[in-house]
């Protein structure tokens, strides 16, 4: 019987994971990785994703629109830049995960990166919008360089930020709570930037100057929030073997460990597809509101309806996932999302039906947002149980890679499909094929992705195995 199919209880005949896979637990102490995480620390952890969304989500929603309708760059060129950049950046995620696993400092292995890179992230975002008035070729070069710079710095922040969840606690329910706070505050960020970006840019004169000032403000806010996350969190989960702390696992061995972790592959692929969905949903809404509903201010209305009802649903995610499991909650959420799209399909030009369908989609998205990164965190213990190697940084690099490549593919699809449909930037009248392309981006493609994510989750059964895996690991300490 292979290790994969053997029972989880320890017996003399079974092959136990090497002792280097152990984790340190000091029951009853402030450093106990199974203890309840204090409320302020949950809030502080969640503020990290709020910080990211002041820049990253604002970019996801408006960057294609800014480049096509403010700067005047062709949509197809932007789509190609986005895809190349995100795929390249996905490779850097793996490298960053390895760097985190090797990091040793008095602040821990993940937290110090929040301190070191908060300011560079804000500066790089401002540079992204400061496109010089030069020839189209050099504008394209500038956009490619600055966009890759933003992605690279974001990697340096987001991989350690995601890893921090698994270093704060080893308890499955506490991780779910942290993820609920993370995604709830992330949604607050989405709500704020989707409603404030256009008005603030207009307030500061509109055009390129208004956008630069807007992102300078967002960058300053994001920097402060990242520093708050750094100050308010603690790393508690440590490898028990002192040699392991001083001599991290070689890169080749760490990559081989990921290859043996099928749940990591499923969770990473799920996150990737989710962020394709997110990029299409957030990027296409600007075009849908302007050209199908004839009012760009409806961007705020639609996005607000979506986010408010995701937040409302998030209040119930932790108890639901505790009782029924994260996988089952996600599947039900995807089905509810499909119902929301069904309501929208009744009349794709009716504002009320679009908003009603969006409200239903928001409720369905709550268990998805509230559970997907907790899914990834649980694969750390599975990998440790199966191989004896605990590599949080490498595992969470998969989540970051999924975000980057998924967002890049989604943004690239946005640009490519608009170009294929004959979209003409600048706010003019669009052809029927261009209007259908916008409908496909906002409705039809996301529906297909929902169905694909349901299929993926049918293969994820770690929820029911996790308690026995953790007990098996604890018995070997």
List the model feature ranges, each with a label.
Residues 2-15, 23-477:
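Membrane-embedded alpha-helical bundles of multi-pass transporters/translocases
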């Amino acid at each position: 019987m292979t290790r994969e199919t053997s029972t989880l209880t320890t017996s003399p005949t079974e092959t136990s994971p090497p002792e280097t896979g152990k984790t340190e637990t000091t029951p009853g102490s402030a450093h106990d990785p199974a203890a309840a995480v204090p409320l302020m620390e949950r809030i502080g952890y969640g503020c990290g994703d709020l910080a990211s969304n002041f820049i990253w989500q604002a970019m996801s929603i408006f960057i294609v629109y800014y480049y096509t309708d403010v700067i005047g760059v062709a949509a197809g060129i932007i789509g190609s830049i986005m895809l190349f950049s995100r795929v390249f950046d996905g490779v850097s995620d793996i490298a960053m995960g390895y760097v985190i696993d090797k990091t040793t400092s008095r602040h821990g292995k993940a937290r110090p990166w929040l301190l070191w890179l908060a300011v560079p992230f804000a500066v790089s975002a401002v540079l992204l919008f400061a496109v010089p008035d030069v020839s189209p070729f050099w504008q394209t070069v500038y956009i490619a360089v600055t966009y890759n710079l933003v992605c690279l710095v974001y990697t340096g922040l987001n991989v350690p930020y995601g890893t921090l969840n698994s270093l704060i606690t080893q308890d499955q329910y506490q991780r779910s709570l942290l993820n609920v706070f993370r995604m709830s505050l992330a949604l607050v960020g989405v709500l704020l930037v989707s409603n404030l970006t256009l008005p603030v840019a207009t307030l500061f004169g509109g055009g390129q100057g208004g956008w630069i000032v807007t992102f300078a403000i967002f960058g300053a806010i994001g920097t402060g929030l990242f520093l708050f996350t750094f100050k308010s969190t603690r790393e508690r989960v440590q490898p028990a073997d002192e040699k392991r702390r001083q001599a991290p696992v070689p890169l080749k061995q760490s990559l081989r460990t990921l290859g043996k972790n099928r749940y990591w592959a499923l969770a990473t692929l799920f996150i990737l597809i989710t962020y394709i969905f997110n990029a299409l949903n957030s990027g296409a809404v600007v075009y849908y509101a302007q050209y199908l509903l004839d009012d760009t201010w409806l961007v705020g209305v639609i996005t607000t309806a979506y986010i408010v009802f995701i937040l409302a649903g998030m209040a119930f995610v932790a108890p639901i996932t505790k009782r029924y499991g994260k996988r089952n909650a996600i599947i039900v959420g995807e089905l509810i999302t499909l119902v929301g799209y069904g309501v929208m399909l009744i009349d794709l030009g009716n504002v009320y039906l679009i908003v009603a369908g969006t409200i239903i989609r928001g409720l369905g998205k709550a268990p998805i947002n509230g559970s997907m990164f907790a899914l990834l965190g649980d694969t750390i213990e599975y990998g440790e149980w199966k191989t004896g190697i605990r590599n949080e940084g490498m595992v969470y690099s998969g989540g970051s890679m999924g975000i980057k490549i998924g967002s890049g593919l989604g943004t690239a699809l946005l640009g490519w499909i608009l170009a294929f449909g004959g979209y003409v930037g600048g706010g003019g009248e669009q052809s029927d094929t261009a209007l259908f392309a916008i409908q496909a981006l906002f409705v039809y493609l996301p529906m297909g992705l929902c169905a694909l994510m349901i299929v993926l989750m049918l293969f994820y059964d770690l929820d029911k195995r996790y308690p026995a895996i953790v007990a098996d690991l604890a018995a070997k300490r």
